[in-house]
Amino acid sequence: MTSDETLAVLIRYLDNPNPTVEEAVEVFTPMTIGEYDDVHIAALLATIRTRGETFADIAGAAKAFLNAGRPFPVPGTGVLDTAGTGGDGANTINITTGASLVAAAGGLKVVKHGNRSVSSKSGSADVLEALNIPLDLDPERAQRWFEASNFTFLFAPAYNPAIAHAQPVRKALKVPTIFNVLGPLLSPVRPEFQIMGVANPRHGQMLTEVFRELGRTRALVVHGAGTDEIAVHGTTQVWELKADGEIISYEITPEELGVERCDLTDLVGGDGVENARHMRAIFDGTGPAAHRNAVAVNAGAMFYLNSQADSLREGTAHALSLINDGTVADWLKTHEEIDYRG
């Protein structure tokens, strides 16, 4: 039951068109511990949606839920996390997930913080499970898997259980809310580097500013021709947080990345099992060029962000070489055969 004191905090926030980050932390913290009735959660989410999410809304909510979350027992220094908002409706193969595996095979430290499918046929957890990559590891075993392979998957509900307090309301509302952009910001490892794909480009600049507020050293927010990843079917909008704190924005095409343009229909996938088959085909050299290139340009951004490449184009070329010479296929074969649950 919402207390009078908590209700007063909520009302002040609902009446404030320009809240501060600190005020947002204050209003979202009761939600993380179940102090709001569902009707008050709905009022908060609907108000923010109606007036439009602000930098303070997103940064403050992220800080509140990170404070309530369970951290992963690995320092974030040198670690990269990558996730997208989803919701683009494209139902592509799991491009960002595949790119994460390429990056790990290439020596980057990658944490994939994600969930099962919400708006598509296959979420990151669905395809990784079909690739025999462990999902249900406790923190100690997940750390062991990470140290052995440079990669681990952190199942979002296990590390951010406070999100569950808002789930009934989100399901009942059946409209996008601030939580649709919040999830990727809540990485339990507090990574130094992060790439986030957004389905709605209007969030690009704001989310890059949020990454700066959350202490990321470098970050990329991308929107690729209607999808929440770097596109090989069209032009990608990029917002880049540089190491000195400057934020720049630009566009990049498949041709500038050094790959052929394709149609979005060439990238349509299926469920987790089908997308895992596509992933293996990419890595063993039997898959379509469009699939390989889509994974490579997104992995290339990871190499660029971690200063392993001087440009997105150079990063793409490096990712393609790792796929073409069998490095990624060998990496996957090695680590799917080891049982990290014991």
From Swiss-Prot:
Binding site for Mg(2+) 2: D228, E229
Cofactor(s) the protein needs: Mg(2+)
UniProt pathway: Amino-acid biosynthesis; L-tryptophan biosynthesis; L-tryptophan from chorismate: step 2/5
Gene3D superfamilies: Nucleoside phosphorylase/phosphoribosyltransferase catalytic domain, Transferase, Pyrimidine Nucleoside Phosphorylase, Chain C
EC class (word): transferase
Residues engaged in binding anthranilate 2: R170
EC number(s) reported in the record: 2.4.2.18
GO biological process: L-tryptophan biosynthetic process
Molecular functions per Gene Ontology: anthranilate phosphoribosyltransferase activity; magnesium ion binding
GO cellular component, one term: cytosol
Disulfide bridge positions per record: none
The record's free-text note on cofactor binding: Binds 2 magnesium ions per monomer.
Binding annotation for anthranilate 1: G84, N115
Catalytic activity: N-(5-phospho-beta-D-ribosyl)anthranilate + diphosphate = 5-phospho-alpha-D-ribose 1-diphosphate + anthranilate
InterPro entries: Anthranilate_Pribosyl_Tfrase (IPR005940), Glycosyl_Trfase_fam3 (IPR000312), Glycosyl_Trfase_fam3_N_dom (IPR017459), Glycosyl_Trfase_fam3_N_dom_sf (IPR036320), Nuc_phospho_transferase (IPR035902)
Coiled coil regions in record: none
Residues noted as binding 5-phospho-alpha-D-ribose 1-diphosphate in the record, renumbered to the chain: 84, 87-88, 92, 94-97, 112-120, 124
UniProt-annotated binding residues for Mg(2+) 1: T96, E229
Keywords: Amino-acid biosynthesis, Aromatic amino acid biosynthesis, Glycosyltransferase, Magnesium, Metal-binding, Transferase, Tryptophan biosynthesis
Subunit organization: Homodimer.
Family according to the record: Belongs to the anthranilate phosphoribosyltransferase family.
HAMAP family, alphabetized: TrpD (MF_00211)
NCBIfam families: trpD
Function: Catalyzes the transfer of the phosphoribosyl group of 5-phosphorylribose-1-pyrophosphate (PRPP) to anthranilate to yield N-(5'-phosphoribosyl)-anthranilate (PRA).
Protein name according to UniProt: Anthranilate phosphoribosyltransferase
Organism: Corynebacterium efficiens (strain DSM 44549 / YS-314 / AJ 12310 / JCM 11189 / NBRC 100395)
